[in-house]
């Protein structure tokens, strides 16, 4: 893993954690296992340093690599996110819940349809990423943007599931996802734009406030 690449990833994590995010997903699944494990450990350290004294410590999850997430668990990694090319979510969840993962180990699943969302709910996933909600070049393989109306439908269909909106989410439309019923949002480019850090901080604070209002309402 090139040092420059590692430094940029950790800098992006610092910015996101400073903005007040609850979760950071390590997406470099193509790294060799040892390098990915080391990156996850460093991410945990960054999160702890940047949120010192703050009870809302950002939690770290690893994309796809259940083996690395479990190996890094002792160092503070909190879970794994399973995409469409990952292990079967039901199999992974049953195996982890059989005493093979730490208590509280989160397992999230990417979903792109109502059927997939209900399947994840039946498997007792901790949360789902659902989308793409908006147009985005990074999600073209999953079809056209599905929009806020469909997002709201998904949230109503799986009321006991935390639904995280993904796909084209930015500073302008993030709040509308929460208003549609999502528990949170996931984004990449928004948190990589260091030129708008104050705006991002405001967006994250707004999402936290809206989420609190949704729960209390």
Roles of regions detected by a PLM:
Residues 1-88, 93-126, 146-149, 153-163, ...:
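Conserved N-terminal beta1-alpha1 strand-loop-helix module at the mouth
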Residues 26, 134-140:
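A short acidic, helix-capping loop that chelates divalent metal ions and anchors anionic groups
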Residues 130-131:
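Flexible, Lys/Arg-rich cytosolic regulatory linkers and terminal tails that connect or flank
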Residues 143:
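Glycine-rich ATP-lid loops
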Residues 185:
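C-terminal binding/interaction regions
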């Amino acid at each position: 893993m090139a040092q420059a690449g590692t430094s940029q990833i950790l800098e992006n994590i610092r910015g996101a954690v400073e903005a007040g995010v609850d979760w950071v997903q390590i997406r470099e699944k193509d790294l060799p296992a040892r390098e990915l494990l080391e990156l996850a450990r460093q991410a945990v350290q960054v999160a702890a340093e940047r949120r010192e004294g703050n009870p809302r410590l950002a939690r770290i999850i690893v994309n796809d690599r259940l083996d690395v997430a479990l190996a890094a668990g002792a160092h503070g990694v909190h879970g794994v996110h399973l995409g469409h090319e990952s292990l079967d979510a039901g199999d992974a969840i049953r195996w982890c819940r059989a005493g093979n993962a730490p208590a509280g180990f989160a397992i999230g699943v990417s979903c792109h349809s109502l059927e997939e969302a209900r399947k994840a709910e039946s498997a007792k996933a901790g949360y789902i990423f659902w989308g793409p909600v908006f147009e985005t070049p990074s999600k073209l393989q999953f079809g056209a943007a599905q929009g806020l109306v469909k997002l709201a439908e998904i949230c109503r269909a799986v009321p006991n599931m935390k639904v995280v909106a993904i796909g084209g989410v930015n500073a302008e439309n993030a709040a509308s996802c929460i208003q549609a019923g999502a528990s949170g949002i996931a984004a990449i480019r928004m948190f990589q734009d260091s030129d708008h850090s104050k705006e991002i901080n405001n967006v994250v604070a707004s999402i936290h406030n809206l989420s609190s209002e949704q729960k209390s309402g």
